[in-house]
């Protein structure tokens, strides 16, 4: 494939912003430290300005405030350099469109609807009565069980699995090894053993949802587990049954969301977070990595952190500096207690 090439003026014509210097051609986006003359890079944080001076990048994306320090450099000036970088990167890595056709080793059960615009890879399985939208890409060894509904331009990467009865919105992307709609962990204890509760709900994903590799989203016990439009979930995340996750929320890797948790929209949940079940997390909540969420968060916009117990980020940061000194402080406390005890004995 011939690499895409854009001039700075072509980039700004498509994406906005202002180019300064020579109207050079660039072929890729690279970090400042690695970029060469044919590359474009970016400065998102002004504290790294020195790296721009040391960089061999042909052009750099900067904010208007930072641009004044780089006279003589080829620049694109943008309101948000990081977002602009992401959009430029997309120019060089466009979304792959489906090549219509069904591989001869794929199995499409009777009653399934697969438009001719869809790309169905080797060893794919499409269950009975499942309906695919236009332009879907179901790649090698992926499985879509019966009675599912997929919107237009859904992508299932190799070995992704969608269980029966699930609904995926438009432009959903499921990465390899992810499982959508496996049974939730519902059990009742009786007669010295566990009785499995049938999980009769399903999973519904909104438009533009992305699910990372080896992530599991369990089907609901009676109603659907749901994920709102634009939400992005990282690799190796566990979403329990009956969870309701809002729109445009992001959840980082190794997080576990227990069953029947409701998470609002525009939340940011760091890596390795764990929650108890049956709680609510308000819109625009930020939860730091490794936090144990033990109760509902009812106030929108909170920034929370802490291994245990959960507290505000400010409280956690203030207390965290003492963690590595707890043993020393405990010894000093015992010494002071002993001194006070001895002083009390002497005064008698």
Curated annotation (Swiss-Prot):
One family name in Pfam for this protein: Hexapep
Catalytic activity: a UDP-3-O-[(3R)-3-hydroxyacyl]-alpha-D-glucosamine + a (3R)-hydroxyacyl-[ACP] = a UDP-2-N,3-O-bis[(3R)-3-hydroxyacyl]-alpha-D-glucosamine + holo-[ACP] + H(+)
Superkingdom of origin: Bacteria
Lipid biosynthesis in keyword set: yes
UniProt enzyme class: transferase
Signal peptide: none
Keyword vocabulary terms for this entry: Acyltransferase, Lipid A biosynthesis, Lipid biosynthesis, Lipid metabolism, Repeat, Transferase
InterPro entries in alphabetical order: Hexapep, Hexapep_transf_CS, LpxD, Trimer_LpxA-like_sf, UDP_GlcNAc_AcTrfase_non-rep
PROSITE patterns: HEXAPEP_TRANSFERASES
The protein's Enzyme Commission number: 2.3.1.191
Gene Ontology CC annotation, any one: membrane
Pathway noted in the entry: Bacterial outer membrane biogenesis; LPS lipid A biosynthesis
Active site (catalytic residues): 241 (proton acceptor)
Assembly and oligomerization: Homotrimer.
Family listed: Belongs to the transferase hexapeptide repeat family. LpxD subfamily.
Protein name: UDP-3-O-acylglucosamine N-acyltransferase
Organism: Neisseria meningitidis serogroup B (strain ATCC BAA-335 / MC58)
């Amino acid at each position: 494939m011939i690499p895409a090439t854009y001039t700075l003026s072509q980039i700004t014509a498509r994406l906005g912003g202002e180019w300064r210097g020579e109207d050079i051609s660039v072929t890729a986006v690279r970090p400042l430290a690695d970029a060469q003359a044919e590359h474009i890079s970016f400065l998102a944080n002004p504290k790294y300005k020195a790296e721009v001076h040391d960089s061999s990048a042909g052009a750099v994306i900067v904010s208007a405030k930072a641009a004044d320090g780089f006279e003589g450099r080829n620049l694109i000036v943008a309101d948000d350099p990081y977002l602009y970088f992401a959009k430029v990167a997309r120019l060089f890595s466009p979304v792959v469109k489906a090549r219509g056709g069904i591989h001869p080793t794929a199995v499409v059960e009777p009653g399934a609807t697969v438009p001719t615009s869809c790309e169905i890879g080797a060893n794919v399985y499409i269950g009975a009565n499942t309906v695919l939208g236009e332009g879907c890409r179901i790649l090698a060894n992926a499985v879509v069980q019966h009675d599912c509904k997929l919107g237009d331009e859904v992508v299932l990467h190799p070995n992704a699995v969608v269980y029966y009865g699930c609904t995926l919105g438009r432009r959903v992307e499921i990465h390899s090894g992810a499982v959508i709609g496996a049974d939730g962990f519902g059990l009742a204890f009786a007669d010295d053993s566990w009785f499995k509760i049938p999980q009769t709900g399903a999973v519904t994903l909104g438009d533009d949802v992305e699910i990372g590799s080896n992530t599991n989203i369990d089907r609901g016990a009676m109603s659907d587990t749901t994920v709102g439009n634009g939400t992005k979930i990282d690799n190796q995340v566990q979403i329990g049954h009956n969870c309701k996750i809002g729109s445009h929320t992001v959840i980082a890797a190794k997080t576990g969301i227990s069953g029947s948790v409701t998470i609002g929209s525009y939340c940011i949940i760091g890596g390795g977070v764990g929650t108890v079940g049956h709680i609510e997390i308000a819109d625009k909540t930020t939860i730091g990595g490794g936090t144990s969420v033990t109760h509902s968060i009812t106030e929108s916009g909170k920034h929370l952190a802490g291994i245990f117990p959960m507290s505000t980020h400010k409280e956690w940061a203030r207390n965290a500096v003492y963690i590595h000194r707890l043993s020393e402080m405990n010894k000093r406390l015992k010494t002071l207690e002993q001194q006070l005890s001895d002083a009390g004995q002497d005064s008698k």
